[in-house]
């Protein structure tokens, strides 16, 4: 992040706040003609022999700072916090707002307009259905660049998404499970196209029963989200129950409901839980409390 200096009326100067060890770069998708702001945080400590764990973070404009500072603080004492240092790669957009409407395009599967849930404000949904192209950007453009510039442990890759981002995480898990080893889906918008998710879940369960595949999955929601007509919590819990039966095949799944938290307020506590889930010194851990 570039530091900026501004003159003050009292003769002093004001410097823009910068998180140590971070940078922002622009990247274009070769196949989709789209441009993203990539927020990167690198640990101050040398990489372990296998390389740094990495977390690919969706909606970086809203939560990159939260996750980066949490890793910086907790990663100093892994033996106490259960969090080791990691590279954080946030995927964001050219906007000063926490969220961009482009997330609807990038995080969702193709769905007929008549099958979409009603939008809270009554308007039509923005462009949507581009999840496959977004996944190709991550796999074909972003990951190779990150692995070129940083020492990455390819056996400890996590993807984190919330809301529609959580929906995208589930799509990747159920259709491209080899892409990551740990999947964090917070308040996932399963209601966007629940039949699609359930169909893909059945297929995933069937394949996994035949081929053991160690994967770590954290599903979570805020307690207060249960009152929304989307049934966010029930849907996430139902998916967890379908996946939990695969424990003998190497699937380690957990569902967390955070007391007193809503759809947005859940983010900081979800980040903290996700870090202990994905970055424990001994590998991803369940029920970290």
Swiss-Prot record:
A Pfam match: Esterase
Subcellular localization, as worded in the UniProt entry: Cytoplasm
Disruption-associated phenotype: Impaired growth during iron limitation conditions and a strong accumulation of intracellular ferri-bacillibactin.
Enzyme Commission code: 3.1.-.-
Coiled-coil parts of chain: none
Major enzyme class: hydrolase
Keyword annotations from UniProtKB, A to Z: Cytoplasm, Hydrolase, Serine esterase
UniProt superkingdom: Bacteria
GO MF entries: carboxylic ester hydrolase activity
Record-linked InterPro entries: AB_hydrolase_fold (IPR029058), Esterase-like (IPR000801), Siderophore_Hydrolase_D (IPR052558)
GO cellular component labels: cytoplasm
Function in brief: Catalyzes the hydrolysis of the trilactone cycle of ferri-bacillibactin (ferri-BB) complex, leading to the formation of bacillibactin monomers and to cytosolic iron release, thus making iron available for metabolic use. Can also hydrolyze bacillibactin (BB), however the catalytic efficiency for ferri-BB hydrolysis is much higher than for BB.
Protein name: Ferri-bacillibactin esterase BesA
UniProt organism field: Bacillus subtilis (strain 168)
Name of encoding gene: besA
């Amino acid at each position: 992040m570039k530091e900026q200096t501004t003159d003050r009326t009292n003769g002093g100067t004001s410097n823009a706040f910068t998180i140590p060890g971070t940078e922002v770069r622009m990247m274009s998708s070769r196949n989709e003609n789209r441009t993203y702001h990539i927020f990167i945080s690198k640990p101050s400590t040398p990489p372990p022999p296998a390389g740094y764990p990495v977390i690919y973070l969706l909606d970086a404009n809203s939560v990159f700072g939260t996750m980066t500072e949490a890793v910086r603080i907790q990663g100093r004492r892994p033996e106490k916090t259960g969090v080791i240092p990691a590279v954080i790669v946030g995927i964001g957009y050219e906007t000063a707002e926490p969220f961009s409407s482009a997330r609807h395009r990038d995080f969702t599967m193709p769905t007929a307009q008549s099958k979409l849930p009603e939008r809270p404000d009554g308007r039509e949904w923005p462009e949507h259905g581009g999840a496959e192209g977004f996944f190709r950007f991550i796999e074909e453009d972003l990951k190779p660049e990150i692995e070129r510039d940083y020492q990455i442990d390819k056996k400890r890759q996590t993807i984190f998404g919330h809301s529609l981002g959580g929906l995208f995480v589930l799509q990747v898990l159920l259709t491209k499970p080899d892409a990551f080893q740990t999947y964090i889906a917070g308040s996932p918008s399963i209601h966007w196209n629940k039949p699609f998710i359930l169909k893909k879940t059945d297929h995933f369960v069937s394949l996994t029963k035949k081929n053991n595949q160690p994967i770590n999955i954290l599903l979570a929601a805020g307690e207060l989200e249960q009152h929304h007509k989307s049934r966010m919590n029930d849907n996430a819990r139902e998916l967890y129950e379908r996946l939990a039966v695969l424990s003998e095949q190497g699937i380690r799944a957990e569902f967390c409901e955070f007391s007193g938290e809503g759809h947005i307020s859940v983010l900081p506590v979800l980040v903290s839980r996700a870090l202990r889930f994905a970055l424990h010194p001994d590998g991803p851990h369940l029920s970290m409390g």
